[in-house]
Design a protein with these regions (language model features):
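Extended catalytic cores of very large enzyme megasubunits
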Residues: 1-269
Length: 269
């Protein structure tokens, strides 16, 4: 309610041109819808409900990018393709048979994605969906991410006859937003990256071995999408004597610059 298809057409069509591609039409249409979300920017025609129209438009574009069509293929085909591409762990095909994946496929409700706001779809794309970070290509859609995460969590559940029930319950709760998962968990489950800590606290002592070891650990954890907390309270201030005054401490600033460089060198955002 409170949205108008004709208003979207009126807003987007002036930007169309001869020879325009369908991708460009999608992008211009999305931009027009997003502009209508802001009631201050469009006081007479805008409404916050356009955020859900924009979500549907962005989802349509995502599915075309990932699957080449709006309707997703079978879950087994998606998993098999992404395992072959090295984006999913090969263990997924060891833990579960094709029949198991087909059973999970029946549990998925892809229509849930159509109820998401534009901001929610963009957040899933930007933070959680498996992608090639060099090319930007995305390889799954939100409901697939939730199901692969559920399958990974319960792959060792005993008895095996109960696994599918647990997977279904977990998937339904996660996809309905009844609980949230930390970014490295939701983004990493089912992938070759086995690091699920959102925040890692690293403590540095006031000696070179510890200072340089802290920098190494920061870089390694950052490369696996972990957030970093650094405790530096043990470092002495500038000018403090070292080895009885043979040399003096250079203070925190040089080491803070070093640690910042270590972090930025491998940060994945």
């Amino acid at each position: 309610s409170d949205v108008s298809q004709s208003m979207i057409e009126i807003t987007s069509q002036p930007h169309f041109f001869d020879g325009i591609t369908t991708r460009e039409i999608d992008e211009l249409t999305l931009r027009a819808i997003v502009d209508l979300i802001d009631e201050e920017q469009a006081p007479e025609t805008g409404h916050t409900n356009y955020q859900f129209v924009a979500g549907k438009q962005r989802l349509s574009m995502l599915r075309k990018d990932v699957y080449g069509q709006y309707q997703p293929p079978s879950l087994y085909e998606i998993v098999k393709k992404n395992v072959k591409a090295g984006l999913y762990t090969p263990e997924l095909l060891d833990w579960y048979s094709e029949e198991d994946w087909n059973e999970m496929d029946k549990m998925i409700n892809h229509e849930k994605d159509e109820d998401a706001s534009y901001a929610a779809v963009e957040q899933m794309i930007g933070k959680y969906l498996v992608r090639n970070r060099s090319t930007g290509q995305i390889y799954e859609t939100p409901q697939v991410r939730y199901m692969v995460a559920a399958a990974t969590v319960f792959h060792k559940e005993e008895p095996e006859s109960a696994r599918m029930r647990y997977i279904k319950e977990y998937y339904n709760c996660a996809s309905d937003g009844l609980f949230t998962l930390a970014t490295p968990v939701l983004a990493g489950l089912g992938t070759p990256t086995k690091q699920f800590s959102s925040c890692v606290l690293i403590k540095s002592d006031d000696d070179l071995d510890s200072i340089f070891a802290s920098g190494e650990m920061m870089a390694k954890y950052a490369s696996k999408r972990a957030g970093i907390g650094l405790e530096i309270g043990r470092l002495r201030p500038l000018g403090s004597p070292i080895r009885g005054g043979e040399i003096m401490h250079t203070g925190m600033i040089p080491f803070l610059k070093k640690w910042f460089g270590d972090l930025r060198s491998c940060s994945q955002g």
